């Protein structure tokens, strides 16, 4: 058992039980990942879970401290295996997410994206007043709103650039990683055996194709965010923003000492039912 801040973080058994150690076939690999690979078995690489533990410990500290100082996290995972996990875990701790498709310039041209967010909210308000438009206009606006929600629903409340990114599959999300690099935004990411570790500041070697692996690691990241939120609101009241209602509920769900629940991997309770899908504004997450 590895410990951090008095809480159990994760175990090698957690990682193995969730298939985090499985890499790609030996034909699909990045030589820069050599230091994170333990061995080869049956034509596939086995990742070194000791390196994964080190990556998790370092990343959790950074995420917790960043959120405690007021930073926000953008969760990114648009591959089918990651969509529901990203939506669920980011929503659980009130963070932003992209789970459908990354829009080029979302970070580097955020001022333009912000205008689209304003437009989305205008359309939502206009939809409540059916008397100001014809049925045809309502249909056109409805389609525009659906498109905006599909692309930007997960960042509807993002008013500034995130302090860090959590990325599932840096190869697929290469544009997002590159935009973050240009802006100096740190990236925490799952790195499979075919990824480039030089592109991220906080690599966590792991299987980025397995739903169980993605859920375990993303859940750990979300728990680190939750711990950071608790620490943020332990600061002097004059130095922090008023606590949002969802943050009050998060604190109330902890124990009497104010600690968040332990990060225990496979024993983590799930919030809601994945089979029910995302919230209404994100009902088209899947391709």
From Swiss-Prot:
Family affiliation: Belongs to the universal ribosomal protein uS2 family.
InterPro entries in the record: Ribosomal_uS2, Ribosomal_uS2_bac/mit/plastid, Ribosomal_uS2_flav_dom_sf
Gene Ontology CC: cytosolic small ribosomal subunit
MF terms in GO: structural constituent of ribosome
Record GO biological process: translation
CDD domains xref list: RPS2
Region (Disordered): 233-287
Name of the protein in question: Small ribosomal subunit protein uS2
UniProt KW Transcription keyword: no
Protein species of origin: Tropheryma whipplei (strain Twist)
PANTHER family for the chain: 30S RIBOSOMAL PROTEIN S2 PROKARYOTIC AND ORGANELLAR, SMALL RIBOSOMAL SUBUNIT PROTEIN US2M
Sorted UniProt keywords: Ribonucleoprotein, Ribosomal protein
Residue spans of biased composition, Polar residues class: 250-259
Pfam families in alphabetical order: Ribosomal_S2
